[in-house]
């Protein structure tokens, strides 16, 4: 019989030959696996089927069949003779077919080996837009009447490989306006009508295509006259250098026959173009010879002037005040004023203090004596500076700057000073400039300095730092009519004039008038490698039109960068088409490492920047928009911004970041001014309204636990040639070197290992096939894959939970064992099916937090083709040999964020791995390196406490949220102004939020309640982890994202506006007192029964539900056809385990065995914090039976011989011996300390039944 299992087969016949013409309704070209499953789910009837292209084998197909609400997938592979066959199990004869139609016809009959016969073909959903609705609906791309276009006829060869030549410029006519790309109108008519006539002619044996020939001749008719003009001009130029040249062009023009047929016209045009090519080459050779002859008799040229050195950074001074406590202020009398002078070139910081008698007192600190900068998050213009006074002693001074911008400028100058005088051969951090501009098909003005220097509106750089050159400049333009070479020269000349540096062009890629250019400092040219360019068309049939994207990627030493510049579909109502443009670009743009072809470009690069004219508009009345803009109130407008809305629905730019927008909409201005928006346009079809919008955007996505900060994001206000304003963004990006181990290559004795204890994934699919995982990383010699999963279950027809134990997972061996190398590495995972070898989801995990002697938990999200498809969690560790534990401080770890300065003078500053400036919605602050050497941490592990319990893990800090420092309960306080050493755990996870005894960030604060149970001391030092999400700026609600350093402070998934939140576990529902029949929330047990128990501590009230239908359906097939499928996968997957495992309670943290405590974000399955290795045993008895077996312990003695008998004997006495293994494993092996156990500890040990928890706690209470 036909089988769904097998290895990938060879490529073969393409779909065109296999299908025949026209394509049948059941064939879906470019349909994703997830979309196919949703179409079949909507059909809902057994035997529904469709055929799509295979995602794993080029030229192959996938037959998807629905049977009993499950989707079964069969691969259809071509053989060497282009015959097609369904992949079968071993031993089953193979049936071969010439076309897919024949294959489907056979398998439509019963008993042919499939799970059922093919009965009901499923057609693809029709697009809402009519087929003749072209991509120029709002007139955005029309050429302006003023200023006129340049009359230059020079054609510059493109720099990037694969770029099309620039088309010769033609006069603007009404016909050209209706067809911006020159072919769209005529070609569209051919595709609608004449295409079928040519097809019939070919079937009749014709060897030519008369209608296509006529179409091409008509389209190129104007090109004839243009070529004639160019040839005539070149003939005159040729005679300047060669008087004897023959008038060949004149004869050629005279030979033209005005009554030529379409085919003769094309032949004549090809001949002219060939002559034109020879003429251009000949003129260059003749001119070179003549000029060489002239130069041989000319006087010698004067010597070239010496190359100017780059401009030096002048000494900058900052006026500050010393921030002192109230007590110090009374002693001093008034606050002290200082002047901080930064000498970048000299590597010095001078503190100048003016005293009352006009005398000056100054202190000079060299760059190596400035130990740390600590930004205050509460006071935006406050900065703490830690100086080295003498050996091993530091002093912290807090300064108040004039403004937050001055503080940022001071920090940037000090970082530049550190970088200049660093002893490292390779940089740890570079500065990247991103610029995007729709030029409106007119040449740029002579002066675009404001764009290059990030001056204008929004978040801009301080004037002190605008002249500091960036390491990399990336310019993305749309509707750029300037030739590639001319544009590149213009950019280099502008940068040369601004910085005195001759920037090197790394790549230039063009598609029509969409261009991206990358230039780097000369000193970095040899650090760039693996340059790749690509382009994608997104017009009609992804072929015609003027929309699309261009991209560039490269390696900067050991860090991969990707840059995508796009121009998406225009029109207020074209949101869905813009979304599809984005998904097409994500899937089809070919950039980066070819070995990572299983991953889309959002996961192939350490840092991916996506920018351009995205064309998303504002959904608001024009007058309201104008009123808000006039009042500079952008918050209401950002709430109706289409890009923000689509991102909140997880439809586009999944877990990308964008800096907060604080500048006015960049489109559509009156040309020549920035005071008026040209929103009213008269068109032949009527009046067109182009509302002011933020069409031009810059977004980015970075791997978890990497460093990236957006220092500016705004637009210019003095470049007025286009109806768009140029936008800019500057970024501070951490980079890694091409690591060379001082110890040499790893030997067997000192090999590092990446070991997995278990992995569990929840995958969005209606299939019930088996899965395996592939592991990719630059630290591995080759990719590795696991065995198929050994367990799987499903409580929801559209989701499948699959699990791998350590036996099914490989042990990975990195090529280098040094910790300094491994802490910069990442692991890419893809979950693939055994039936079709197609990916069901991909993710990235940082190794940095996994390094250690004990296993660490990771939790992140799966995505495929830009869609969220599930989540994955696991337990793993990276073992590093002791002799390879040496590491060093990174430059970007020099600045940290102090979120809570309350009592800062009486306690140590919060030395976190960085956090965020609240002014920057998605800024990633610099982490601060722990001063304790890593080798010391491994050599001197913490001693366990004498209680017999496992030691509580040390406090961890997160880049997104440093821990709130707690007052020390014992020990001497820290000396005033002296920074305390960081905690003894150097491998915290900055990609996840670390919470210590604080409520969930997204839940409303609770009023104090005297009845609330205090936080148990046993969990005092536990570290809770939740998964962050990149916020869309302060104006947008946060969402859960993968463990990415680009994420904001968020602890859960919020549903999109048009969907109600997922149902919380029953235990999280709080009824009003009048409706709650019994005290305490309802708790659902493993057997599905309900029991009542006391409300758990730290419970949070359920947030109010937005209006909308109740989310009762868990089967996607039951969703109405109008469902926009935007609800988060994790919200829908949440109900998977509510029956199997009792939830820990709302807002509660479920402790994992080991050093980390996993707090399940909202929207994840309720058992997400359950221990991976020690699940609680299944409780089959009913609650009543359990209660009948319970026996109270006598008063006056220990429960069940507590203290005399062992743990097992006590548990057997009360009938709960099943929990002995879990309790012992979690450290509760000593009955003397069992009285300290809490409800959370019981849940951690696997006691999920509320009646059993109550029995254990009551018994222990009686024994006290």
From Swiss-Prot:
Tyrosine phosphorylated by the members of the SRC family after exposure to a diverse array of extracellular stimuli such as insulin, growth factors such as EGF or PDGF, chemokines, integrin ligands and hypertonic and oxidative stress. May be phosphorylated upon IgG receptor FCGR2B-binding. Phosphorylated at Tyr-992 following cell attachment and spreading. Phosphorylated at Tyr-1168 following EGF signaling pathway stimulation. Phosphorylated at Thr-964 in response to PDGF. Residues 26-122 form the SH2 domain. A motif (NPXY motif) lies at residues 989-992. PROSITE patterns: SAM_DOMAIN (PS50105), SH2 (PS50001). Its EC number is 3.1.3.86. One of its GO terms (molecular function) is SH2 domain binding. It catalyses: a 1,2-diacyl-sn-glycero-3-phospho-(1D-myo-inositol-3,4,5-trisphosphate) + H2O = a 1,2-diacyl-sn-glycero-3-phospho-(1D-myo-inositol-3,4-bisphosphate) + phosphate; 1,2-dioctanoyl-sn-glycero-3-phospho-(1D-myo-inositol-3,4,5-trisphosphate) + H2O = 1,2-dioctanoyl-sn-glycero-3-phospho-(1D-myo-inositol-3,4-bisphosphate) + phosphate; 1,2-dihexadecanoyl-sn-glycero-3-phospho-(1D-myo-inositol-3,4,5-trisphosphate) + H2O = 1,2-dihexadecanoyl-sn-glycero-3-phospho-(1D-myo-inositol-3,4-bisphosphate) + phosphate. InterPro entries: Endo/exonu/phosph_ase_sf, IPPc, SAM, SAM/pointed_sf, SH2, SH2_dom_sf. GO terms for biological process: actin filament organization; apoptotic process; endochondral ossification; endocytosis; ERK1 and ERK2 cascade; establishment of mitotic spindle orientation; gene expression; glucose metabolic process. The modification Phosphothreonine is found at residues 170, 964. It is an enzyme of class 3 (hydrolase). The keyword DNA damage does not apply. This is Phosphatidylinositol 3,4,5-trisphosphate 5-phosphatase 2. It comes from Canis lupus familiaris (Dog). The gene is INPPL1.
């Amino acid at each position: 019989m036909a089988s769904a299992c097998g290895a990938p087969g060879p490529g073969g016949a393409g779909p065109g030959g296999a299908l025949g013409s026209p394509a049948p309704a059941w064939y879906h070209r470019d349909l994703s696996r997830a979309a196919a499953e949703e179409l079949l789910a909507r059909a809902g009837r057994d035997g529904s089927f469709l055929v799509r292209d295979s995602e794993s084998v080029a030229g192959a197909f996938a037959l998807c069949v629905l049977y009993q609400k499950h989707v079964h997938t069969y691969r259809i592979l071509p053989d060497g003779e282009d015959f097609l066959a369904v992949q079968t199990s071993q031993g089953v004869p193979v049936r071969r077919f010439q076309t897919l139609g024949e294959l489907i016809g056979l398998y439509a009959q019963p008993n042919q080996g499939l799970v059922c016969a093919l009965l009901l073909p499923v057609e693809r959903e029709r697009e809402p837009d009519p087929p003749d609705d072209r991509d120029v609906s709002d007139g955005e791309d029309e050429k302006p009447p003023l200023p006129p276009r340049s009359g230059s006829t020079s054609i510059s060869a493109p720099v990037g490989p694969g770029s099309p030549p620039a088309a010769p410029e033609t006069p603007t006519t009404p016909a050209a306006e209706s067809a911006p790309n020159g072919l769209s109108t005529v070609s569209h008519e051919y595709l609608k009508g004449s295409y079928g006539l040519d097809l019939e002619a070919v079937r009749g044996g014709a060897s030519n295509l008369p209608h296509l020939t006529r179409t091409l001749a008509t389209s190129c008719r104007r090109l004839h006259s243009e070529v004639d003009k160019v040839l005539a001009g070149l003939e005159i130029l040729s005679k300047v250098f060669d008087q004897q040249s023959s008038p060949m062009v004149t004869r050629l023009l005279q030979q033209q026959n005005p009554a030529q047929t379409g085919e003769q016209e094309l032949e004549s045009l090809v001949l002219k173009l060939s002559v034109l090519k020879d003429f251009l080459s000949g003129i260059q050779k003749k001119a070179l010879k003549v000029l060489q002859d002239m130069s041989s008799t000319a006087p010698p040229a004067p010597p070239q002037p010496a190359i100017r050195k780059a401009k030096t950074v002048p000494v900058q001074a900052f006026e500050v005040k010393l921030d002192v406590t109230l007590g110090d202020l009374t002693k001093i009398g008034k606050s002290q004023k200082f002047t901080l002078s930064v000498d970048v070139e000299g590597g010095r910081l001078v503190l100048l203090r003016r005293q009352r008698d006009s005398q000056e007192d100054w202190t000079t600190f060299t760059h190596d004596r400035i130990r740390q900068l600590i930004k205050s998050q509460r006071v935006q213009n406050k900065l703490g500076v830690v100086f080295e006074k003498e050996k091993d002693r530091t002093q912290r001074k807090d300064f108040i700057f004039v403004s937050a911008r001055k503080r940022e400028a001071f920090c940037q100058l000090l970082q530049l000073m550190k970088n200049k005088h660093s002893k490292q051969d390779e940089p740890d951090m570079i500065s990247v400039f991103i610029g995007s501009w729709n030029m409106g098909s007119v040449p740029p003005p002579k002066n675009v300095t404001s764009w290059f220097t990030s001056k204008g509106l929004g978040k801009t750089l301080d004037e002190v730092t605008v002249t500091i050159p960036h390491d990399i400049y990336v310019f993305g333009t749309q509707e750029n009519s300037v030739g590639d070479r001319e544009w590149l020269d213009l950019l280099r000349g502008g940068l040369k004039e601004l910085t005195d540096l001759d920037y090197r062009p790394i790549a230039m890629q063009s598609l029509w008038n969409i261009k991206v250019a990358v230039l780097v400092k000369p000193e970095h040219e040899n650090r760039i490698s693996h340059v790749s360019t690509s382009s994608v068309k997104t017009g009609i049939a992804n072929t015609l039109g003027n929309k699309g994207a261009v991209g560039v990627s490269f390696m900067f030493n050991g860090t991969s960068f990707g840059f995508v510049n796009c121009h998406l579909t225009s029109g207020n109502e074209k949101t869905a088409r813009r979304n599809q443009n984005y998904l097409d670009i994500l899937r089809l743009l070919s950039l980066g490492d070819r070995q990572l072809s299983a991953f889309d470009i959002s996961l192939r690069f350490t840092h991916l920047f996506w920018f351009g004219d995205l064309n998303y508009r504002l959904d608001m009345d024009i007058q309201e928009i104008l009123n808000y803009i006039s009042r500079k109130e952008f918050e209401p407008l950002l709430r109706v911004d289409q890009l923000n809305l689509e991102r909140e629905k997880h439809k586009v730019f999944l877990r990308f970041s964008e800096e907060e927008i604080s500048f006015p909409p960049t489109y559509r201005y009156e040309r020549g001014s920035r005071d008026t928006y040209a929103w009213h346009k008269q068109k032949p079809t009527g009046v067109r309204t182009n509302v002011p919008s933020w069409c031009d955007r810059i977004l980015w996505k970075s791997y978890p636990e990497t460093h990236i900060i957006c220092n500016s994001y705004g637009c210019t206000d003095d470049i007025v040639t286009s109806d768009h304003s140029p936008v800019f963004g500057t970024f501070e990006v951490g980079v890694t070197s091409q690591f060379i181990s001082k110890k040499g290559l790893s030997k067997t004795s000192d090999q590092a290992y990446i070991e997995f204890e278990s992995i569990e994934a929840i995958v969005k699919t209606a299939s019930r096939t088996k899965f395996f995982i592939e592991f990719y990383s630059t630290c591995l010699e080759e990719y590795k894959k696991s065995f198929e999963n050994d367990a799987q279950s499903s409580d929801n027809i559209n989701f499948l939970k699959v699990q791998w134990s350590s036996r099914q997972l490989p042990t990975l061996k990195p090529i280098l064992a040094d910790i300094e190398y491994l802490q910069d590495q990442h692991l890419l995972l893809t979950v693939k099916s055994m039936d079709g070898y197609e990916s069901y989801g991909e993710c990235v995990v940082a190794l940095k937090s996994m390094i250690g002697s004990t296993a660490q938990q990771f939790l992140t999200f799966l995505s495929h083709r830009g869609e969220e498809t599930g989540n994955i969690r696991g337990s793993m560790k990276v073992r590093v040999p002791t002799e390879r534990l040496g590491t060093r401080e990174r430059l970007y770890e020099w600045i940290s964020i102090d979120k809570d300065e309350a009592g800062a003078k009486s306690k140590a500053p919060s030395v976190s791995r960085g956090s965020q400036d609240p002014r920057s919605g998605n800024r990633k602050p610099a982490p601060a390196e722990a001063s304790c050497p890593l080798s010391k941490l491994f050599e001197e592990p913490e001693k366990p406490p004498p209680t017999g319990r496992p030691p509580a893990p040390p406090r961890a800090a997160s880049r997104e949220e440093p821990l709130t420092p707690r007052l020390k309960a014992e020990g001497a306080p820290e000396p005033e102004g002296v920074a305390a050493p960081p905690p003894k755990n150097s491998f915290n996870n900055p990609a996840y939020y670390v919470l210590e005894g604080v409520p969930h960030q997204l839940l409303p604060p609770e009023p104090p309640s005297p009845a609330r149970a205090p936080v148990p001391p046993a969990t005092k030092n536990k570290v809770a982890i939740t998964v962050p999400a990149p916020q869309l700026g302060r104006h947008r609600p946060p969402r859960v994202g993968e463990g990415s350093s680009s994420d904001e402070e968020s602890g859960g998934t919020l549903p999109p506006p048009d969907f109600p939140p997922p149902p919380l576990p029953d235990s999280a529902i709080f009824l009003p007192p009048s409706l709650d029949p019994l005290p305490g929330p309802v708790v659902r047990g493993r057997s599905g029964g309900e029991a009542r128990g006391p409300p758990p501590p730290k419970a949070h009230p359920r947030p109010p539900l937005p209006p909308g239908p109740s989310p009762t359906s868990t089967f996607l097939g039951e969703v109405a056809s109008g469902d926009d499928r935007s609800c988060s996968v994790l919200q829908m997957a949440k109900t998977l385990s509510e029956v199997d495992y009792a939830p820990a309670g709302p807002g509660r943290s479920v402790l994992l065995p080991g050093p980390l405590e996993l707090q399940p974000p909202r929207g994840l399955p309720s058992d997400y914090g359950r221990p991976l290795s020690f699940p609680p045993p299944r409780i089959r008895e009913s609650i009543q039976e359990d209660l009948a077996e319970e026996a109270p312990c006598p008063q006056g003695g220990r429960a069940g011989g507590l203290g005399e008998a062992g743990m097992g004997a006590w548990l057997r006495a009360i009938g709960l011996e099943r929990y002995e293994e879990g309790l012992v494993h979690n450290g509760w092996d000593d009955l003397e300390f069992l009285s300290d156990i809490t409800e959370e500890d019981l849940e951690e040990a696997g006691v999920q039944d509320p009646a059993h928890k109550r029995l254990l706690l009551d018994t222990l209470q009686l024994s006290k």
